[in-house]
Swiss-Prot record:
Keywords: Cytoplasm, Ribosome biogenesis. Its main location: cytoplasm. One of several proteins that assist in the late maturation steps of the functional core of the 30S ribosomal subunit. Associates with free 30S ribosomal subunits (but not with 30S subunits that are part of 70S ribosomes or polysomes). Required for efficient processing of 16S rRNA. May interact with the 5'-terminal helix region of 16S rRNA. One of its GO terms (biological process) is maturation of SSU-rRNA. The gene is rbfA. It holds the Pfam family RBFA. InterPro entries: KH_dom-like_a/b, RbfA, RbfA_dom_sf, Ribosome-bd_factorA_CS. PANTHER family: RIBOSOME-BINDING FACTOR A, CHLOROPLASTIC-RELATED (PTHR33515:SF1). HAMAP family: RbfA. This is Ribosome-binding factor A.
Length: 124
């Protein structure tokens, strides 16, 4: 591995690969439906992992999914310990990722600006 690719990043990448499969196969909580893990950040000493996720639906669905994930975090951590070759698996903290919503809002603003610009003839 290159020197500029730290171990914490590799652990985060592995958690990002393993976690969706574990959630899909092992978590039986109906609040945790279809979700996407967008990013995992592991701190330098690999004690904590912040897991960013997105789901479809409204604010109530996001909150319910977050509650389900928080409730299952200990179980998911223990399942990760069986799959990963680590002495200590990081404690998982789940955070709803609003970047997709922000991106869609920006796209709508750009489309609106382009449509408004198209209505006005260009000055030449």
């Amino acid at each position: 591995m290159p020197k500029d690719f730290p171990r914490a990043r590799r652990v985060a990448d592995q958690i990002q690969r393993e976690l969706p499969e574990l959630i899909r196969q092992e978590v039986k909580d109906p609040r945790v439906g279809m979700l996407t893990i967008t990013e995992v950040e592991v701190n330098r000493d690999m004690e904590f992992a912040k897991v960013y996720f997105t789901t479809m639906g409204g604010e109530a669905e996001h909150a319910a999914c977050l509650q389900g994930l928080q409730r299952a975090s200990g179980f998911l951590r223990s399942q990760l310990s069986h799959r990963m070759q680590l002495r200590v698996v990081p404690k998982l903290t789940f955070v709803y990722d609003r970047s997709v919503e922000h991106g869609m809002a920006l796209s709508r603003l750009i489309e609106t600006a382009v449509a408004e610009d198209a209505k006005h003839p260009k000055d030449e």
